[in-house]
Structure formats: structure tokens, C-alpha cells
A protein has these predicted regions:
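Short active-site segment of divalent metal-dependent hydrolases/proteases
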Residues: 11, 37, 86, 115, ...
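Active-site neighborhood of phospho(di)ester-bond hydrolases with catalytic His/Asp-centered motifs
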Residues: 5-7, 28-34, 54-59, 80-83, ...
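Helix-adjacent hinge/juxtasegments
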Residues: 54-99, 103
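N-terminal active-site segment of His-dependent metallophosphoesterases
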Residues: 1-50, 61-68, 140-142
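A generic structural micro-environment signature
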Residues: 12, 41, 78-80, 87, ...
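Conserved beta-sheet core of the metallophosphoesterase superfamily
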Residues: 51-52, 89-142
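A general secondary-structure boundary signal
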Residues: 24-25, 41, 71-73, 104-106, ...
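Beta-strand-turn-beta hairpins that frame and shape the catalytic cleft
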Residues: 1-3, 71-80, 121-127
């Protein structure tokens, strides 16, 4: 299964469309918030009726009707999806990890910080932030 995981595109649709074109085909698109309205076009851009699309609302998605959080299955794994701002991810990750564990998730995915992060915890929890396609904040900004 091939999954495209993105976050914090902030209506810079060209960036997202470019990565969709480069990575297609894939089986699932996960967007971890701050689409700022672009989610209405995801199905059209992916152009694959078999692709599952999962989106959660970020702190800048003021008018979005999407859920703030989702729990989904990815094969045999249980994933907790959230934007992360409600868990203080800009300051520390322990709170979001505790929430993921309380939900019995194998993977927690979040955005908000605009910095990619991948961590494998001793108890097996995987912590993933894809960063931002539009406004990256990590060194090198790519």
C-alpha cells in the first residue's frame, strides 16, 4: 500500500498538485490539516476512484466541516490523525504520544509545526509529522 501523507499546504495548491502528480498512483492520501479549503478538490486532483482520502481540520481551517481528529486502520495498524495544535506539539510531543497510547494507536500523525519528524518509540508507537509543503521551517527548508 502506498500512502501520500501531507500537512499544512495553506491553500498553496500548486505545491500539493505537483506532489500528487509526482507520487501517483497511490492508495491513500492523508492530509493532516491547514488545507484552507482545498480539500474540496482533492478527489479531482488525485483522479483515482480507488484512492482513499482522509483529511483532518487544522487551526487555520476556519470554515471546514472535516473532523478535528480521526482514527483509521491502515492494514493491520491503527492510526490516530490530528493536526496537533490541541496537543501543544510546537512545545513538546509527550501529550500527543500519551493520547495516541490511550487510543491504542500504533501510529500518530500530526502537522502544525511545519517541521518533519519521525520517531520510533520503545513501546512501538510511531510518531510522524510530514512537515509543510508550502511553508517548511526545518533547516534547508525543503
Amino acid at each position: 500500500m502506498k500512502i501520500l501523507i501531507v500537512s499544512d499546504t495553506h491553500r498553496r495548491d500548486g505545491n500539493l498538485r505537483e506532489i500528487i502528480e509526482k507520487q501517483s498512483p497511490f492508495d491513500m492520501l492523508i492530509h493532516l490539516g491547514d488545507t484552507e479549503g482545498s480539500e474540496a478538490y482533492f478527489k479531482e486532483w488525485v483522479n483515482n476512484d480507488n484512492c482513499v482520502i482522509r483529511v483532518v481540520r487544522g487551526n487555520n481551517d476556519f470554515f471546514s466541516q472535516t473532523d478535528r481528529e480521526k482514527e483509521i486502520s491502515i492494514g493491520k495498524y491503527r492510526a490516530f490523525l490530528t493536526h496537533g495544535h490541541m496537543y501543544g506539539v510546537s512545545f513538546e510531543l509527550e501529550t500527543i504520544k500519551e493520547e495516541a497510547r490511550a487510543r491504542k494507536a500504533d501510529i500518530v500523525m500530526f502537522g502544525h509545526t511545519h517541521k518533519p519528524h519521525l520517531e520510533y518509540c520503545e513501546d512501538g508507537l510511531v510518531v510522524l509529522n510530514p512537515g509543510s509543503l508550502s511553508y517548511p521551517r526545518q533547516d534547508g527548508r525543503k
